[in-house]
Amino acid sequence: MEVDIRRVALKHALANAVKFGGKARVDSVVSKVFAEVPEARKAAKEVVELVKEVVEEVNSMSPESQASLLSELWPEALSGERKVEVKRLPPLPGAEEVGGKVVTRFAPNPDFVLHLGSARPAILNYYYAKKMYNGKFILRFEDTDPRTKRPMPEAYDLIREDLRWLGTPWDEEYIQSQRMEVYYEVAEALIKSGNAYVCTHSQDEIKAFRDAGKPDPCSFLPPEEHMERWEKMLSGEYPEGAAVLRIKTDPAHPNPSVRDWIAFRVLDTEKTPHPLTGDKYRVWPTYNFACAVDDHMLGVTHVLRGEEHAVNTLKQEYVYRHMGWKPPVSIHFGRMNLEGMVLSKSVIRRGIEKGLFSSIDDIRLGTLRALRRRGILPEAIWDLVLEVGIKPSTARVSVDKLHAFNRKYLEPRANRYMFVPEPAKVASIEGLEAPITAEVIVHPSFPERGRRRITFSKPEVYLPSDVASSMVRLMGLGNFEVVDGGSKLRYLNNDVSFAKKHELPIVQWAPVESSVRGRVLKAAGTKIEEISGYGEPSLAELPPGEQVQFVRLGFVRVEGPETYIFTHD
C-alpha cells in the first residue's frame, strides 16, 4: 500500500508543481491523495509524512524535469488545459447614450514600432468597440511633429503589420499629416471667434507674463489682426519659432501648461522635411489640437488612453467648448510596467544606434516584433492586457505572468522534440541489433498525433551530461542500465510499467550518426545566451516559425536552419 500511496503522491505533487511554477504544496497534494484514496485517511499521519518527502523530492527537480516526468508517467494529468483566470472589462460609461455604437481609436505616433505597452491601448480600444459593443475601431497615425518626433517612413507599414498580428484590425484609417487643411479650417474658425490668437512673444517673455499673473498682451488684439498674422505664418513670413497660435483658456489656471496652450507652430520643413509631405507645410498642429479636432470629426465617442494624458484631456476640452462640440468620454488608465523587459522607445532607439541591440526585433526587447520572434502569441498579450484592465493605478506585471498566459495556449500546440544541450556525452548502446528504431510520442496529451520513428544503425547516442542514475529510460526507445560511468547503456526492456515501478528518470537523447547540430538563442537580461546541442533528425524538417517544445529545456520557435529562439520554460 505504501508504494501505491507514494506513486499517487508523486503524481499529484508533479501535477501541482507543473501547474504552479515548479513548487508543489504539501496541503494541496495531501487533499488530492485523500480524495483519490479515501482509505488512506486511516493512516493520515503517516501519509502526510510520506507526502512531505515526495513534495521535497519533486520541488528539488527543475520545472523541465517535472513536466517531462509527468508527461511520461501520467500524460493524462496534462491533458486538461491549464486554467489561467482572465478578468474581463467593465462596461463603458455613456455607451447607452450612443445606442452601443461606440467608436474608439488607436492613435500611434509612427516614430517607432509598437511595443507591449502600446499594445495595451490598441487592445482595450478594439475590445470595447468590436467585442463588447457593435461599434467602430479607428487607426489614426499622429504624425504632425516632423522635427522632435520625426516619423519613420517604414513605421506606418510596420505598425499596420503589428496590429494585424495582434488581432486588432481597424475599420477606418487616417493619417494626420494628410488632414492639414481640416486643421487649418478649424484654426481659422477659432481665430475669427476670438478663441485663438497668434502670439509673437518669446518663451522668456511668456514666462514673465505668467509669473506676474498677467495675460499675454497678444490675446487682446482683434481677430482681424490675428488673421493677418495667421496668413503670415502660412505664407512663411514668420521663421521657425517666431510665432505660434494659442488657444484661449484660463490665464489663472492652476496648471501653467493649460494656460493658453500652443495649437500651431512654425517648423522649417526644408531642414526637417516630413517623410510623407516633404516641405509642403510649415505650420503644424500640436498633438492636442489635431487630436481634439479628429476625435470630433471622426465621431469618436470614447477615448481610452494612459493617465499621462489627463492634462491633455483638460486642454482639448477648450477646443470642444469654443467650437460648441460635445467631448468624447475620456477614460485614463495607469501605466503598465512589465518587469524584466525593455519597453522604452527612446532606450530601444539609443540602444540600436549604439549597437547594444541588433534591431527592432532583438529578442531582449519588448517590441511586438521581438515578442513575436520569441514565440509569444497574440492571445497571451490579450490575456495580459485584459487581466490588467483599465484601472487608474500603475500595474507592475512580471514577465512570468505573460509566460503563464502564453504557456496556456502554446502547450497544446507545441509538439515535443528531443534536444541534448552541450556539454553532452556519448554513450554506446548494448543489447539492441542494428538498425535500431525508436518511436517517440509527438505530444503526450494528444495521442492521436501519433509517434515519430527514429532509425539509426550506429549504436551511439548523445545524452545530457547530468545523467547519474543507475538505470534510465530513453524516450521512445526503452529502459537501460547505465554502466561504465555513463559511457555505455545496456538494454533491459521497453516496458513502461517497469520504468514506472522503478521510477526511472526519463532522458532525451539524439543518435550520433544523424543528429542535427543546433543552437538555441535565449534572452537573459541584457545578454543573449547561446545553448548549443544535438537534436533528433526530424528537427531538420521543421519550417521557420514552427513552435515546439524541447523536452527538459522549454518552448522554442524555429528561426531558421539549426537556429531556435527560446520562448520560456
Curated annotation (Swiss-Prot):
It catalyses: tRNA(Glu) + L-glutamate + ATP = L-glutamyl-tRNA(Glu) + AMP + diphosphate. Its EC number is 6.1.1.17. GO terms for molecular function: ATP binding; glutamate-tRNA ligase activity. A motif ('HIGH' region) lies at residues 108-118. Its main location: cytoplasm. The keyword Ribonucleoprotein does not apply. One of its GO terms (cellular component) is cytosol. Coiled coil: none annotated. Belongs to the class-I aminoacyl-tRNA synthetase family. Glutamate--tRNA ligase type 2 subfamily. This is Glutamate--tRNA ligase. The lineage of its organism: Archaea, Thermoproteota, Thermoprotei, Thermofilales, Thermofilaceae.
